[in-house]
């Protein structure tokens, strides 16, 4: 009996745990600055053909479309600014109404006379009928309304160059206010020609863009259910 009470008490205590013990009373730590980003190797892009080599005694470099030196980001380690200005609105309203009714009546009858062979009465009347009725109805309605407005800028670093000259960029920004850490990450592939003269590029010109904006800290922990409740939600069949 005592073991059962102890087990229930431990489950209740686990359900109330929302913060790691080592993080109680501490602000979230900032991530270390990744100075090695400019020399990252991206094996997922190794399937591209090799870049042409630079010819000796040539003023034109086949690896670049620019004849003169361009101060914009072009090689691993260079920095450019990504401008994120998202103002999306979506409003979808779907409604379906389906009804199907089917009815059927099937009947049959017959009569029998006196048998001419035995002379016995072998006659009779038979009447059989079958009625069928089917009714099916379905209705559905769905409404989606979404509005997003994000406006910010973040500096990203060129981590690699593809054989065709496109640049792989990655950027991260962390701002800690009191005990809440706001984290912004951006990554993707850009064309050098899309980078403006002031070394900026819009988010909608980034291919394979991965943009995340979130945080961690006390406010984020309050918004999340405790660990015990998450475990119970995963294994509870109800």
Swiss-Prot record:
One of its GO terms (molecular function) is cytoskeletal motor activity. Residues 1-16 form the signal peptide. The keyword Lipid biosynthesis does not apply. Keywords: Bacterial flagellum, Cell outer membrane, Lipoprotein, Membrane, Palmitate, Signal. Its main location: membrane. It is found in: Cell outer membrane; Bacterial flagellum basal body. A lipid is attached at residue 17 (S-diacylglycerol cysteine). Transmembrane segments: none annotated. It is a lipid-anchor. It holds the Pfam family FlgH. The basal body constitutes a major portion of the flagellar organelle and consists of four rings (L,P,S, and M) mounted on a central rod. Assembles around the rod to form the L-ring and probably protects the motor/basal body from shearing forces during rotation. Belongs to the FlgH family. PANTHER family: FLAGELLAR L-RING PROTEIN (PTHR34933:SF1). This is Flagellar L-ring protein. The lineage of its organism: Bacteria, Pseudomonadati, Pseudomonadota, Alphaproteobacteria, Hyphomicrobiales.
